[in-house]
Amino acid sequence: MYFCRQYQEEMMKKTVLYTLFLLFSTMVKAQDSETAFNFLRLPVSAHAAALGGENISICEDDAALVFHNPALINYVEDRTMNLNMMTYMQGTLTGAASYTQAINDRATWGLQGRFISYGEMKQTTYDNQETGTFRANDFALGGTFAYGLTEHISGGITAKWAASYIGHYNSMAVAVDLGMHYFNEESQWSVGAVARNLGGQIKAYEDDFERIPLDLQLGVSKRLIGSPLRFSATLVRLNDWEYGIGKHLVLGADLLLSEQFYVAAGYNGMRASEMKISSGDDTSAHGAGLSLGAGMTLERMKLHVAYGKYHVSSTSLIINFSYTL
């Protein structure tokens, strides 16, 4: 029995190592900014959203971080459920849910789902004559496995299926997220690497297949020893060098007031650039790119809240609630 268990652990370790090797060995061409399934770019974790909308390196008991780096579920308490709500554009409804469970001391699995409903919209002809209404919805389902490769390094993979419905048109896609994470408790350094949305459409809206939003990311976090301050820097869209380095950088800072409470703030250069609006001779992002948030832990319950801007027409509030059974 001992040798059987040891063999299974070695096989899991080799499988995860081989899969994660693809993260660094696959050369990816730059992709166009026009992609389908762009709702997969929206943040789910309120803590990550507060730190600029992208963070793959903080080491926290936060079940929603699996949407950002699958390796991070290894730090989540066994049998944890998480619910998410996000305000987005007017008339839309956005949410997500996840469940995480430990297999043993080194392995964890989880299930996730997310959706966005754009509500009812007017259907018009080319000459702007109304012909009725239609609805649009996006959603994705996924399963995650993570494994502790060493004392300090974990690897994870999420396989997911996504679908999009726009009136009587629909599209489907399959993809995987690959992630690695390093954490040293003594030095309080942590590093993450992620390849998100590796895959593509398996059914197009019409005849032409479109890309899905592939995103290669590298991040680092460091808590100052003896201080409540922790700083994070994340490089995003490393597969697309159409932009300058400043637009690829996401910065965030945590003030860890206690084990039960934190406040956070961040800045996302890419988001600020994409949402700039011109008015006469002036161009302004109107606060886009800046984000704030806070979180607290009460025994088995955790509550995280973040505020940011992810659409030119409105600001967003993200709320995570998790409970450990």
Explain the meaning of each model-derived region:
Residues 8-9, 24, 36:
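Coiled-coil-like amphipathic alpha-helices with heptad-repeat character
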Residues 11-15, 151:
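Positively charged n-region of N-terminal signal peptides that target proteins for export
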Residues 31-325:
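Subset of outer-membrane beta-barrel
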Residues 1-11:
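Short, Lys/Arg-enriched N-terminal segments with co-localized hydrophobic residues
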Residues 6, 16-17, 34-35:
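Generic early N-terminus positional signal peaking at residue ~5-7
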Residues 26-30:
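Sec/Tat signal peptide C-region and signal peptidase I cleavage site
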